[in-house]
Amino acid sequence: MARISSDPLMVGRVIGDVVDNCLQAVKMTVTYNSDKQVYNGHELFPSVVTYKPKVEVHGGDMRSFFTLVMTDPDVPGPSDPYLREHLHWIVTDIPGTTDVSFGKEIIGYEMPRPNIGIHRFVYLLFKQTRRGSVVSVPSYRDQFNTREFAHENDLGLPVAAVFFNCQRETAARRR
């Protein structure tokens, strides 16, 4: 009899659609507007995620460096994501035990704007082999591939991941 996984990254199909697995070896927190922490599978509205969040790395040390990737695997819509993935943000060279403000932003934050259906927005944290090791930078955001990016930059599997769901807001909701 097959075992049903309770891992939210498997249930939410982040593992499978975006990455092959996640080591979950480092703790990462993502917080919008200083009080809206991202939890796997929770819904956040576009008005809450307009500005880049604070992303903290609770692991490694000042000699360990990490790369953060934020992506939307449900483009243009979750029922037919033929443009998978859309890249929203990349920050490299983040020292362990700090936050993304200490890293190097190579692709600026783009706020989520889902048009069709409920989209997953995925934060992935990769451990770098050394500072400055991320050299292959995507030239465009559309049809980004997290697996290829990780492979090209020798990042391996993510050491932390979290995702939230987001859908288009009605005008009444934004008030």
UniProtKB/Swiss-Prot annotation:
Pfam families: PBP. Belongs to the phosphatidylethanolamine-binding protein family. GO terms for biological process: negative regulation of flower development; vegetative to reproductive phase transition of meristem. SUPFAM superfamilies: PEBP-like (SSF49777). InterPro entries: PEBP, PEBP-like_sf, PEBP_euk, Phosphatidylethanolamine-bd_CS. Expressed in tissues surrounding vascular bundles in hypocotyl of 2-week-old plants. Disruption phenotype: Plants do not show a phenotype similar to those of TERMINAL FLOWER 1 mutants. Disulfide bonds: none annotated. May form complexes with phosphorylated ligands by interfering with kinases and their effectors. Can substitute for TERMINAL FLOWER 1 (in vitro). This is Protein CENTRORADIALIS-like. The keyword DNA-binding does not apply. Its main location: cytoplasm. Keywords: Cytoplasm. It comes from the Eukaryota. The keyword Cytoplasm applies. It is found in: Cytoplasm. PANTHER family: PHOSPHATIDYLETHANOLAMINE-BINDING PROTEIN, PROTEIN CENTRORADIALIS-LIKE. One of its GO terms (cellular component) is nucleus.
